[in-house]
Regions:
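Extracellular/periplasmic periplasmic-binding protein-like sensory domains
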Residues: 245-319, 374, 378-385
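Short, low-complexity disordered leader/linker segments with a strong preference
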Residues: 1-39, 70, 102, 384-386
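An alpha-beta-alpha
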Residues: 148-209, 231, 325
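Beta-alpha junction/loop-to-helix N-cap segments that form part of ligand/metal-binding clefts
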Residues: 24-29, 52-57, 71-142, 210-214, ...
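Extracellular/periplasmic bilobed ligand-binding domains
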Residues: 189-284
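Hydrophobic alpha-helical segments within soluble ligand-binding/sensing domains
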Residues: 93, 151-174, 187-189, 216-218, ...
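Extracytoplasmic "Venus flytrap"
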Residues: 34, 38-62, 84-90, 112-115, ...
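Segments of small-molecule ligand-sensing domains
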Residues: 305-315, 326-377
């Protein structure tokens, strides 16, 4: 999902092919375990370089299942959430999934990052296991099989949404794109943005790229600025975004910046003395923390109380993914796999990241929050659909 993720996952896969170990197990019971519990599996990187994402997503799922158990569980039984650590490695993830099968799971909430999720989906296809990823944005995930769903939007979906926003809300006529050519996430957003922008009659005056390890973007920015775009799309993650926006402002760029959910957290890495570099920036995200929605605010409060930290979009999506699976099982009236998959396909769920139904590819149909950054603060610029 993330640029950083893509790099470490590639390294982890190489290591896994040469010396694959048994995944460390973390079994979490979301409430009092007893005979006759409904066992739902979870997969996430709980250790390793991408553990920050796995911990957040799995914490969100834990909170959801604990709330459900406190309210009586589902189908008259408590949920036993069995969570395994796959360390961000596709081979480890498949091994962990096999362990979950041995433990008798009836559904799976996971995985978190895209490469392990695709690997597990290929294996889960054989079992018709009801499976939902909270945060795997690679479009290929849900194309694997009819039993695979996702709670988040896709990379191309974000690009299309931001192109529509730029055309309809910002009324721009000329935009540029600067993206990471070595990252699927960045490339997926960039390509979809370009296609959608041009379809809206917006000129894409420059389409520039850079490598994963680059930290000097002045050559590309100079080329971009020579054509005077009104906005620049930066479909990358907040550490890189902070570098690019600073260099662009230093070169005299005064237009808008656009981005995807990888921007979430950029205010935490830009020094207050330079915070104005982010003025007139807009990025897509799964929710806006200051949205007055009652369910969202309840989640934010409960999560902070339980885990002593502020939730991020990974946590929110983990929560929604768990609740989606539980609702599908409840609607199915049993843990029969085919019945649960059928119920999920027809679900209508009111979540904290939006009201969710699924399209024919089992991707969520929901609105996306576009966040504006001005004066070092975030505000909701719009809620946008594709």
């Amino acid at each position: 999902m993330k640029k950083f993720m893509t790099t470490v996952l590639s390294l982890a896969l190489i290591a896994g092919l040469t010396a694959c170990s048994t995944p460390a197990a973390t079994t979490t019971t979301a409430g009092p375990a007893a005979a006759g519990t409904i066992k739902i599996g979870g997969l996430a990187p709980l250790t390793g370089d991408v553990s920050v994402y796995g911990i957040a997503a799995s914490n969100g799922a834990k909170l959801a299942f604990e709330e459900l158990n406190a309210a009586g569980g589902i189908l008259g039984q408590q949920i036993d959430f069995i969570l395994l650590d796959e360390k961000g490695d596709p081979t480890e993830a498949v091994n962990a999934y096999t362990q979950l099968l041995d433990k008798g799971i009836v559904a799976l909430v996971g995985d978190v990052t895209s490469k392990p999720t695709i690997a597990v989906a290929e294996r889960a296809k054989e079992d018709n296991m009801p499976m939902i990823t909270a945060t795997g944005t690679n479009q290929a995930i849900t194309r694997v099989s009819e039993n695979v769903f996702r709670a988040c939007f896709t990379d191309p979906g974000q690009g299309e949404i931001m192109a529509n926003f730029a055309a309809a809300n910002l009324k721009v006529k000329k935009v540029a794109v600067l993206y990471n050519t070595s990252d699927d996430y960045s490339q997926g957003i960039a390509e979809a943005f370009k296609t959608a922008a041009e379809a809206k009659g917006v000129e894409v005056s420059s389409y520039e790229g850079y490598g994963a390890d680059d930290d000097d973007f002045k050559t590309q920015l100079t080329t971009i600025m020579a054509k005077s775009p009104e906005a620049i799309l930066l479909p990358d993650y907040y550490n890189t975004v902070a570098l690019i926006t600073k260099q662009a402002r230093d070169l005299g760029y005064k237009g808008a910046f656009l981005g995807g959910d990888g921007w979430d957290g950029v205010l935490t890495v830009v020094d207050q003395s330079n915070i104005a570099i982010l003025d007139n920036s807009y990025y897509s995200n799964h929710y806006f923390k200051n949205d007055p929605d009652e369910n969202l605010q309840k989640f934010l409060k409960s999560y902070k109380e339980k885990f002593n930290m502020e939730p991020n979009s990974f946590a929110a999506l983990g929560y929604d993914a768990a609740k989606l699976m539980a609702q599908a099982i409840t609607t199915a009236g049993s843990t029969d796999k085919a019945a649960v998959v059928a119920a999920m396909k027809n679900i209508d769920y009111k979540g904290i990241t939006g009201n969710i139904k699924f399209d024919e590819f089992r991707d969520p149909v929901k609105t996306t929050s576009v966040i504006n950054i001005t004066g070092g603060a975030e505000s909701l610029a719009a809620k946008v659909s594709k």
